[in-house]
Amino acid sequence: MARVTVEDAVNKIGNRFDMILVAARRARQIAVQGKDPMVEEENDKPTVIALREIELGLVTADTLDADERQTVREREAAEIAAVAAIAEGRNAI
């Protein structure tokens, strides 16, 4: 079992409350959304992996925001393409 001290992560983010929010968002990305960890997993849980990524400066609130904006843009582009394909199919009839 990995022992993680959060002091380095707190220092990277600024305060404990924001660190918790960032760690939770990143852990959710890893566990639920299937995002790849940026550090070795070492049989750790997603929350521990998220804290290690924060400690190393690999993850910040800004990087998570940018990643989410990119995901939204990709999803919207896919939806627009799907609607265009449907409309094109109707026009062909």
Swiss-Prot record:
EC main group: transferase
Reactions that this protein is recorded to catalyse: RNA(n) + a ribonucleoside 5'-triphosphate = RNA(n+1) + diphosphate
GO cellular component: DNA-directed RNA polymerase complex
UniProt-listed SUPFAM superfamilies: RPB6/omega subunit-like
Gene3D superfamilies (alphabetical): 3.90.940.10
Superkingdom of origin organism: Bacteria
GO molecular function, one term: DNA-directed RNA polymerase activity
Swiss-Prot/TrEMBL keywords: DNA-directed RNA polymerase, Nucleotidyltransferase, Transcription, Transferase
Magnesium is among the record's keywords: no
BP terms from Gene Ontology: DNA-templated transcription
Family: Belongs to the RNA polymerase subunit omega family.
Subunit structure: The RNAP catalytic core consists of 2 alpha, 1 beta, 1 beta' and 1 omega subunit. When a sigma factor is associated with the core the holoenzyme is formed, which can initiate transcription.
Role according to the record: Promotes RNA polymerase assembly. Latches the N- and C-terminal regions of the beta' subunit thereby facilitating its interaction with the beta and alpha subunits.
Name this polypeptide is given: DNA-directed RNA polymerase subunit omega
Provenance organism: Shewanella piezotolerans (strain WP3 / JCM 13877)
